[in-house]
């Protein structure tokens, strides 16, 4: 089976065929660094991570570019309100973003492109649009893209430009479909911008949000590239405007495949600070939640469907991941025997790849994983898995986790003291004598000292770091 993805441009499932053999250019819309990213943002970033990982799993060589929007209406407003220089203000949120994606085990992009470092490319793109008659200077001295000059405007978001009011212009970065009009590609300086401006051939001002991504994506991936992703809220106006200005400038198709993930709800509703349902990743970690469990919740859904994020779902994910980790420890401790798990491993890989090839069907992929764990546990219970088979099981898990990113294969080595070993021995005596009260008491005492006991079906007990 080959990978099929849902192309938002045309709204249909298509076979993924890159432009250049096994090379894939991937542009992912990154954060606007005016605040800490919220959990809804990370739903998109985690899904994009799954996409990249599975492309690499499938043998593609991916070049991922992610933008960091460090100059726009929001960042300027935030810097002004905090009486900080724009670069100082945005730098702290860039830093926190990188810390957050590391906590969620999201692979770093090959290049993070900051808008403020690419002003010359943006100026050149605007100049090209003006030379070709697609952009004009307004009476406020800002430069606007004329959407009626671009016949295909609205094809991504489904907008009929023939019904638009002539002369309508929009200077702000974000707006609804009902307010569509010519959009700013270069914003003339005004007092609200304070010290944020560039003196260029276009005049004193700054780029519009949409021109930033067009200029940066084409610089690093070419005038036409394979994949552009983002949240569904980026579809309009941002991605629609990217297509218009890029294709108007080059005369070429901008992107072959567009992919968008749906919104994340919290407790069934849109996130709201007033309702106490607005979470940053840091908020959740401060509540004691495991980042990998948060990742599991974010990825374990069909990306084109809304997900309802509730704290209980993270607790359930923690239990699921803990079960996998216990399984890994159990398999790792098999040191003898001849049994293998060839059929179970083959079934896992076939089911996993079949699910992922169908528009990144993570829920069915994780279902295959847990069925595999159950089957192999049965083999172990019946002494039907040997050392070589166990090694193959671990290799299969590592292969699957190269996509999911939720497991930990780090072996923790530690030494117990003589006193702790004495407690372990006493606890084994109590367990064998079915003195469960004493057994549990000693188990809890050892756990308080950082040692967790795992009772194996063969009667042995494994001690590991708690």
Task: Label each PLM-derived region with a short phrase.
Residues 272, 278-466:
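Structural preference for alpha-helix termini/caps and helix-kink/transition segments
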Residues 82-88, 109-111, 306-308:
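Short, polar/flexible loop-turn hinges at active-site or ligand-entry regions and domain interfaces
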Residues 64-65, 110-113, 228-230:
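Short catalytic-loop micro-motif centered on adjacent basic/acidic residues
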Residues 61-63, 133-139, 452-454:
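Short, well-structured beta-strand/strand-turn elements
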Residues 10-15, 19-105, 454-458, 462-463:
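N-terminal, positively charged nucleic-acid-binding surface of large information/translation enzymes
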Residues 56, 102, 130-131, 259, ...:
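Alpha-helix C-terminal capping/helix-coil junction sites
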Residues 99-133:
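N-terminal, positively charged, Ser/Thr/Ala/Gly-biased leader segments
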Residues 1-34, 45, 49, 120-332:
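Alpha-helical recognition segments enriched in aromatics with Gly/Pro capping
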């Amino acid at each position: 089976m080959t990978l099929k993805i849902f192309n938002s441009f045309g709204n249909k499932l298509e076979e993924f065929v890159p432009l250049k053999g096994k090379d894939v250019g991937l542009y992912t819309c990154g954060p606007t660094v005016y605040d800490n990213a919220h959990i809804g943002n990370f739903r998109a970033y985690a899904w994009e991570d799954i996409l990249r990982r599975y492309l690499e799993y499938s043998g593609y060589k991916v070049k991922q570019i992610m933008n960091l929007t460090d100059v726009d209406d929001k960042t300027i407003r935030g810097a002004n309100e905090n009486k900080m220089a724009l670069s100082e203000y945005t730098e702290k949120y860039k830093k926190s973003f990188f810390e957050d994606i590391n906590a969620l085990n999201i692979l770093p992009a090959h290049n993070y492109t900051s808008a403020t470092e690419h002003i010359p490319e943006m100026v050149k793109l605007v100049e090209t649009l003006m030379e070709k008659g697609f952009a004009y200077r307004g009476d406020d001295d800002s430069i606007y893209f004329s959407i009626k000059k671009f016949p295909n405007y609205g094809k991504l978001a489904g907008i009929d430009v023939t019904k638009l009011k002539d002369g309508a212009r929009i200077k702000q970065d974000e707006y609804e479909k009902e307010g569509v009009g010519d959009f700013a590609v270069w914003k003339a300086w005004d007092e609200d911008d304070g010290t944020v401006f560039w003196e260029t051939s276009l005049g004193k001002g700054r780029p519009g949000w949409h021109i930033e991504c067009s200029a940066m994506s084409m610089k690093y991936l070419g005038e036409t590239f394979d994949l552009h992703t983002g949240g569904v809220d980026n579809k309009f106006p941002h991605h629609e405007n990217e297509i218009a200005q890029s294709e108007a400038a080059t005369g070429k198709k901008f992107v072959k495949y567009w992919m968008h993930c749906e919104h994340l709800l919290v407790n069934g509703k849109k996130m709201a600070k007033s309702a106490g349902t607005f979470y940053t990743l840091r908020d959740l970690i401060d509540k004691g939640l495991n980042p990998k469990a948060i990742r599991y919740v974010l990825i374990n859904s069909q990306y084109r469907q809304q997900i309802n994020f509730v704290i209980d779902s993270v607790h359930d994910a923690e239990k699921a991941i803990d079960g996998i980790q216990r399984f890994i420890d159990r398999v790792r401790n098999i040191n003898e025997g001849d049994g293998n798990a060839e059929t179970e491993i083959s079934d896992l890989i076939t089911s996993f790849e079949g699910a992922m090839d169908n528009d990144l069907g993570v829920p069915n992929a994780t279902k295959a994983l847990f069925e595999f764990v159950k089957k192999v546990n049965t083999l172990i219970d019946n002494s039907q898995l040997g050392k070589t088979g166990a090694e193959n099981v671990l290799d299969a898990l590592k292969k699957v986790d190269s996509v999911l990113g939720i497991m930990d294969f780090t072996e923790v080595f530690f030494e117990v003291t003589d006193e702790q070993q004495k407690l372990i021995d006493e606890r084994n005596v109590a367990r064998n004598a079915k003195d469960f009260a004493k057994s549990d008491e000693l188990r809890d005492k050892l756990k308080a000292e950082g040692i967790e006991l795992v009772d194996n079906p063969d009667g042995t007990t494994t001690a590991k770091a708690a």
